[in-house]
Amino acid sequence: MAHQMAAGNSLDSTCMPRIGPHVREMENCHSEKTCARIWKTVRDESTYGTDELIQVALVYKYVTRKTPEAFVLISNRLKGGKYDMNSVKKGYKAKDGLQEISNYISSLDREGKQVLACMLILSTQSIGKTVLVELLAGISGKHPMEVLPVHTNNIVMYDSDSEDEHRDLWLDEVAKQLNTLTPVLKGKYETAEEKEICGLVKQRIEDFRELEKLAAGSGREYDKRMYTKGLLKELCSILQGHQVIKLKGLTYQILVGVGEQLYQLLKSVD
């Protein structure tokens, strides 16, 4: 679901001036399609700097809860700098509570904030509004206190679940991708190859759900992520295998597309 802010509290005040209109349009729309169009426009325009691209990507992530297309190419620009990306990510994850997170962000210089922003954009977690504003302001070279009190106190969120920070968005995204497969798996198969591959995928998913039911019914705690990672490894081996190349049309497009998304999800937690 999209986020929307009350009038007069636009995030563009925290961003670099040139991308202000783009940021304003993104935060006021409920359309992922609109955000994707804006991102592509900025990404493909060579005059925009890395700072500006990261800020647009941050807002894209905040509004859509997704990583903008080909953002990894932007994040690669920061490799080889003074910050190790994984170390920055671990430092962030080690903090407990908003105050510790805020202090950690404040301890980073501009380059460090860029690196952290990239890590959050590429992750499957949502970005909270306080973290968003602090990163945007820091990348712009502004002190967060210039803008943070106004934004965190007065932003009006219109979707009731927007602040659910404890929800596992990674599992949500996996479920979404698996649901995308449903029409293909339940449809009529045009070729023997299509029937075979769809049958394999369907069987793996059914086996996973049966295993999950058994684990849930055992009365013991179980790691749902661990079970799900096992499923993704099996599905990726099928959907990225040589047999899929034999398929054609919409079935091929959906299976390959979902396979790539599942691979990225698996890679993000491995």
From Swiss-Prot:
Location in or out of the cell: Virion
Keyword Acetylation: no
GO CC aspect terms: viral envelope
Primary localization class, coarse: virion
Keywords annotated in UniProt: Viral envelope protein, Viral matrix protein, Virion
Any Pfam family the entry gives: Mx_ML
GO molecular function: structural constituent of virion
Protein name: Matrix protein 1
Biological source species: Dhori virus (strain Indian/1313/61) (Dho)
Lineage, uppermost ranks: Viruses, Riboviria, Orthornavirae, Negarnaviricota, Polyploviricotina
Gene: M1
